[in-house]
């Protein structure tokens, strides 16, 4: 177990000024509460996939994931990856983008998300996978070192296929706020992070179109990614 550290001083919870994307996530939180799921996951927790038939912010569609309603442009996202290269979400226009928020010390939810995204890319085949970009944003500015990230990506089969973005607590905190993501160090086990466990499906035109809980299946991504890329 890592030596306990003090939580970061920067705000780690979204505020009422979080912007357009925050309304998407807050709508989803209401839905998930209604159906008995959990949108804010602890590092050892889990979540049920929100029903796509619920209409309070999520609508039925041809997608297997939950369709955001109304769909909104993806908020800004520009950080360095663990290799020090600047990555901007806008550079992937024309591709489906699957965006999630992870950390390398996570004992269960994050490995599950990363591994299932890797399986989905494998099952798509090279042609379809080339039209998909997976992005993870760190929720652990202290623990997600370049060495830790490289090992995590290799361990879960997404090395070279997932852009893992890192930064200072201040840099990451701004992104969490913009995307309406909850992230905070656990009070009793500060090496763990309580965080939102969603995957955002973003269309080729840069629109946040679908949402997936941590319990998504690779088959859902295999089905939805080509639709996202072409929409």
Task: Name the predicted role of every residue range.
Residues 1-76, 231:
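N-terminal targeting signals for export/organelle localization
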């Amino acid at each position: 177990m890592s030596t306990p550290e003090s939580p970061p001083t920067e705000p780690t919870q979204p505020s009422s000024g979080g912007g357009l994307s925050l309304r998407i996530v807050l709508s989803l939180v209401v839905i998930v509460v209604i159906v008995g799921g959990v949108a804010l996951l602890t590092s050892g927790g889990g979540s049920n996939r929100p029903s796509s038939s619920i209409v309070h912010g999520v609508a039925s569609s041809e997608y297997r994931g939950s369709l955001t309603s109304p769909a909104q442009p993806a908020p800004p996202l520009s950080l360095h990856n663990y290799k020090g290269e600047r990555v901007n979400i806008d550079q992937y226009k024309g591709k489906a983008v699957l965006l999630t928020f992870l950390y390398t010390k996570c004992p269960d939810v994050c490995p599950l998300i990363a591994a299932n995204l890797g399986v989905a890319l494998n099952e798509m085949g090279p042609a379809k996978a080339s039209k998909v970009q997976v992005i993870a944003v760190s929720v652990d500015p202290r623990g997600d070192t370049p060495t830790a990230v490289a090992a995590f990506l290799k361990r879960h089969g997404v090395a070279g296929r997932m852009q893992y973005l890192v930064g200072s607590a201040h840099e990451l905190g701004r992104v969490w706020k913009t995307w309406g993501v909850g992230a905070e160090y656990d009070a009793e086990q500060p090496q763990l992070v309580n965080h939102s466990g969603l995957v955002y499906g973003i269309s080729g035109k840069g629109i946040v179109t679908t949402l997936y809980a941590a319990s998504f299946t690779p088959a859902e991504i295999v089905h939805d990614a080509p639709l996202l890329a072409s929409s």
